[in-house]
């Protein structure tokens, strides 16, 4: 059994099956986040499928181009965008704005690396675009407008369209593909730097959004012990708001750690909202997949396939655990149920209601948007 073929093939099958299930859930419930996640998982599956086909029959220029766009450029960005739509009615917009800004900043800072020689002014343009969009998302979030995911979508969709244009105009030297001679894993060395810079732009934005979104949701839905207080009430004086915005990540981290014992007790008692374990699994999946991709960029390509396989396993498990995403688990596009309709435990709903109380304008812990029940993040 050749793992170079089996591992990406199984990864592709799991990702595409996952995408099919998400499309089915979207067809019934019309959750925008389900549709966007489904698109992201289709890209994940196609990218892994290209690797399996190449391992079995050799690389071609068509496979190489398809692999790079779907697997290396698009997947993480679209999965992160799905998280933005899931949390579109909350203050998570600040986190997405930070993800966008860091992606643009990284793209600009690496412009002088040898592999990006010839990129010209594109790194600066990417940075400016990311900065402006990040500012716009933050402003929309500040005024509690749930339109900020549309701005997030403009970044991801815009980068996707640009990557298509750059790919269509790129001429690759023979043989039309490049692989690591030691492991046979594909590498992006043949693509123009303007296109290659879109990879960290979308990957950092998407991976950070997935991981931060998982931490955000875990914090909102876990029984909280508030050790450090903060407020993101937009009605407070500007200097106080900026101070609270600055300390919010530290306060959330401290409060999250302090809340872990109570969360463990709620889990044992069957009172924990499904969003908590689900989002932890999703965060682990995003981290593992991103880690494998990052290591491959530094020449350690032997972890590339394993990282993608483990990533899709954790992501799939996280989404299946989430009652919000899969209230009914069934064979896609049929009425054949694989179990009964699932409901959150009564204790979990009380914990979610407690999160609403903490979210009041005069509260000290604004995890969500004003007047928006946090258990209805999906819209």
In which residue ranges do the predicted regions lie?
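Individual alpha-helical transmembrane segments in multi-pass integral membrane proteins
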Residues: 1-15, 31-134, 306-313
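First transmembrane helix
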Residues: 1-28, 137, 204-223, 246-262
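Extracellular-loop-to-transmembrane junctions of the mid-late helices
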Residues: 3-11, 114-219
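Membrane-interfacial loop-to-transmembrane alpha-helix junctions, especially the N-terminal start
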Residues: 28-41, 91-100, 147-155, 272-282, ...
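Aromatic-anchored segments of alpha-helical transmembrane domains
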Residues: 44-49, 102-112, 159-167, 284-292
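Membrane-helix boundary/juxtamembrane motif in polytopic membrane proteins
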Residues: 142-159, 215-284
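C-terminal transmembrane-bundle signature of multipass membrane proteins
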Residues: 212-221, 255-359
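Long, low-complexity, intrinsically disordered segments
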Residues: 354-379
């Amino acid at each position: 059994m050749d793992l170079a073929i089996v591992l990406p093939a199984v990864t592709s099958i799991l990702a595409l099956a996952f995408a099919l299930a998400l499309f089915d859930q979207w067809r019934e419930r019309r959750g925008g986040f389900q549709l966007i996640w489904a698109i992201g998982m289709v890209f994940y599956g196609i990218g892994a499928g290209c690797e399996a086909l190449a391992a079995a029959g050799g690389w071609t220029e068509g496979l190489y181009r398809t692999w790079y766009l779907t697997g290396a450029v698009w997947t993480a960005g679209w999965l992160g965008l799905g998280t933005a739509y899931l949390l579109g009615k909350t203050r998570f917009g600040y986190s997405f704005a930070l993800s966008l800004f860091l992606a643009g900043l990284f793209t600009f800072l690496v412009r002088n690396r040898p592999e990006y020689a010839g990129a010209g002014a594109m790194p600066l343009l990417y940075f400016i675009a990311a900065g402006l969009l990040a500012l716009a998302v933050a402003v929309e979030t500040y005024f509690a407008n749930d339109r900020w995911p549309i701005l997030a979508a403009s970044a991801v969709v815009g980068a996707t369209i640009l990557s298509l244009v750059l790919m269509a105009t790129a001429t690759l030297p023979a043989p039309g593909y490049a692989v690591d001679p030691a492991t046979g894993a594909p590498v992006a060395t043949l693509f123009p730097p303007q296109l290659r810079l879109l990879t960290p732009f979308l990957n950092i934005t998407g991976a950070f959004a997935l991981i931060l979104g998982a931490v955000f949701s875990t914090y909102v839905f876990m029984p909280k012990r508030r050790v450090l207080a903060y407020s993101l009430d937009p009605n407070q004086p500007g200097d106080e708001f900026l101070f609270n915005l600055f300390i919010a990540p530290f306060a959330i981290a401290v409060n999250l750690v302090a809340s872990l014992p109570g969360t463990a007790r709620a889990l044992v008692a069957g009172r924990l909202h499904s969003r908590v374990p689900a989002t932890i699994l999703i965060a682990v999946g995003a981290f593992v997949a991103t880690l494998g991709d990052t290591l491959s960029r530094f020449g350690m390509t032997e972890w590339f396939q394993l990282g993608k396989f483990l990533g899709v396993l954790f992501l799939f498990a996280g989404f299946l655990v989430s009652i919000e995403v899969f209230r009914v688990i069934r064979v896609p596009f049929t009425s054949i149920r694989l179990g009964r309709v699932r409901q959150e435990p009564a204790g979990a709903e009380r914990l979610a209601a407690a999160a609403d109380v903490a979210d009041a304008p005069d509260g000290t812990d604004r995890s969500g948007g004003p007047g928006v029940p946090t258990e209805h993040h999906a819209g």
